[in-house]
Amino acid sequence: MPAIVLIGAQWGDEGKGKATDLLGGRVQWVVRYQGGNNAGHTVVLPTGENFALHLIPSGILTPGVTNVIGNGVVVDPGVLLTELRGLEERGVDTERLLISADAHLLMPYHVAIDKVVERYAGSKKIGTTGRGIGPCYQDKIARQGIRVADVLDPTVLAEKIEGALELKNQVLVKIYNRKALEPAEVVENLLEQAEGFKHRIADARLLLNQALERDEIVLLEGSQGTLLDVDHGTYPYVTSSNPTAGGASVGSGIGPTRITTVLGILKAYTTRVGSGPFPTELFDEHGAYLAKTGGEVGVTTGRARRCGWFDAVIARYATRVNGITDYFLTKLDVLSSLETVPICVGYTIDGKRTDEMPMTQSDIARAEPVYEELPGWWEDISGAREFDDLPAKARDYVLRLEELAGAHVSCIGVGPGRDQTIVRRDVLAPS
């Protein structure tokens, strides 16, 4: 069976956890392939139980599914253990969670540097979560990182941490006037934490490819979204990894030819957390309505999300750079009770119309949305389970988004619950 990639098609917070949870009962593996605890997934079970996951794949809530934290993820050991403990206290079986030996560990000095650098940046800050994600990826690229497998050899681990802190302490003390970290203490704390997860360390790329050879289905779950991709996003207001579909192969060890379906997650409107350009952002009562009705508060940061109308320019862009084959449209129910529902179909930049993603940072910062207005609907759609159950105007809205985005809207979320979903096409069915 093929591998399936599930990615956010906007600036994150699109509802990827709901999509993973919906598909989880029919797949054998769920893999998180990038990012760290700087993003969160919210899953609402049919029982009404609400789970917020930051590092562990959403498939952990589905019995029988093996979950993998892939090599592309940066893992904060303390956060991992806290999240595991929280799940276990609520009766969730976590035995089927594995961690790639090649994933990188997020260290205390990464968090310290992240926070102090962002603080000193002042008005030029990019809105980092302050959880050390960027500095950890910097060390990975500089070949100075600590990998999960290193905890299995205390001698190697101590050598690596001592070497890293020779430089990190210079930065913390001499540049930012902060206290130096003691290498022996960092090593001791990490080895103590490792006792809680080292039995989960595995050769993930081997296991995943063997699973595909056995015709098992592997779901590759990204965090954040396309417009936060370090290469394809609104740089520099991006994350430090590749949430796009290309990152799924690199961050899991599964070859690209194994991937046959790319399921993009789109919110029926647009949100963003932190700094950066946002052409359709609303500052009026409509923005307040979307924020309140949609419950737009970050799962990980607790920060209020900026809200705006649906942006078809970035949806079309996401379709292209990810090779999206299908879309899962979430939170359509939030748009009920609006007289009209605008869709951004293009931009004007210095008076010139464009329907494509601007090439430069300065251009997207100056982009003004060009709207097409569709009539709204007043009906409560949270009970709809078939496409024809939706009001005609809601169906028209979905079909117009589908046309503009350039990929089939196969699933539609009409509420937070797992069962509050309309399936127009089965994305797991053989093509």
UniProtKB/Swiss-Prot annotation:
Q: What reaction does this catalyse? A: IMP + L-aspartate + GTP = N(6)-(1,2-dicarboxyethyl)-AMP + GDP + phosphate + 2 H(+)
Alphabetic keyword roster: Cytoplasm, GTP-binding, Ligase, Magnesium, Metal-binding, Nucleotide-binding, Purine biosynthesis
Primary localization class, coarse = cytoplasm
The annotated active site, in chain numbering, is 13, 41
GO molecular function term, any single one:
GTP binding
**Cofactor section:** Mg(2+)
Q: Where does substrate bind?
A: 299-305
The beginning of the lineage is:
Bacteria, Bacillati, Actinomycetota, Actinomycetes, Mycobacteriales
Binding-site residues for IMP, renumbered to this chain: 13-16, 38-41, 129, 143, 224, 239, 303
Q: In which pathway does it act?
A: Purine metabolism; AMP biosynthesis via de novo pathway; AMP from IMP: step 1/2
Keyword Cell inner membrane appears in the UniProt entry: no
Q: What is this protein called?
A: Adenylosuccinate synthetase
Q: What subcellular locations does the record give? A: Cytoplasm
In UniProt terms, what function does this protein have? Plays an important role in the de novo pathway of purine nucleotide biosynthesis. Catalyzes the first committed step in the biosynthesis of AMP from IMP.
Q: Which family does it belong to?
A: Belongs to the adenylosuccinate synthetase family.
State the organism of origin.
Mycobacterium sp. (strain JLS)
GO aspect biological process, one term:
'de novo' AMP biosynthetic process
